């Protein structure tokens, strides 16, 4: 009886926490422009443009600017939004010859916050049928529970710390990242 009461109490506490799902947003292209508009709600949107300066690609999100580290680096990104929160999470793929993970940014009406780097690549087949370190962006899902963002990976295999000293191949569902109080943290 005690365990049953404890389970009911635990379930009640979990269901009281606010949970918001962040969905992947599709861009509305602006004619004759390099800009894309992502609508968060009927009144809120973010504008993203990619252009080069000094041989480096720049991602401009409203007033927030992020410049790539290398001259040949491509910018690949995904935008996730939640209309109730009036916020967007932008994930920017870090790439050399293969994916090295992604950087996370939270964008709201006040600007952008760099949350940190997520050193995870998808270990999937390339067009040629070989296994390789590919972008994790198509396989990420994001929810927000209370004041914590949870990023999970919907792919069978991931590479943690690609090309690093601690590189390891894991089941994609066995790890997730949380962002809370200014800290991005790996959870196993």
Residues covered by each model-derived region:
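Mid-chain, structured segments of secreted extracytoplasmic proteins
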Residues: 66-101
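Terminal domain-start segments
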Residues: 18-79
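Structural motif
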Residues: 55-57, 97-105, 159-173
């Amino acid at each position: 009886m005690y365990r049953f009461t404890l389970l009911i109490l635990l379930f009640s506490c979990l269901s009281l926490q606010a949970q918001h799902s962040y969905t992947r947003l599709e861009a509305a292209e602006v004619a004759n422009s390099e800009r894309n508009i992502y609508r968060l709600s009927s009144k809120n949107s973010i504008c993203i443009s990619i252009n080069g300066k000094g041989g480096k690609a720049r991602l401009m999100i409203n007033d927030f600017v992020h410049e790539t580290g290398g001259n040949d680096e491509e910018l690949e990104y995904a935008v996730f939004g939640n209309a109730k929160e009036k916020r967007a999470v932008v994930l920017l793929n870090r790439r050399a010859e293969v994916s090295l993970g992604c950087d996370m940014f939270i964008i709201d009406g006040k600007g952008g916050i760099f949350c940190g780097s997520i050193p995870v690549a998808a270990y999937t087949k390339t067009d040629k049928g070989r296994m390789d370190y590919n972008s994790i962006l198509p396989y990420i899902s994001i929810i927000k529970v209370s004041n914590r963002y949870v990023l999970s990976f919907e792919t069978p295999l991931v590479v943690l710390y690609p090309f690093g000293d601690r590189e390891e191949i894991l089941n994609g569902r066995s790890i997730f990242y949380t962002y809370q109080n200014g800290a991005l943290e790996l959870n196993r």
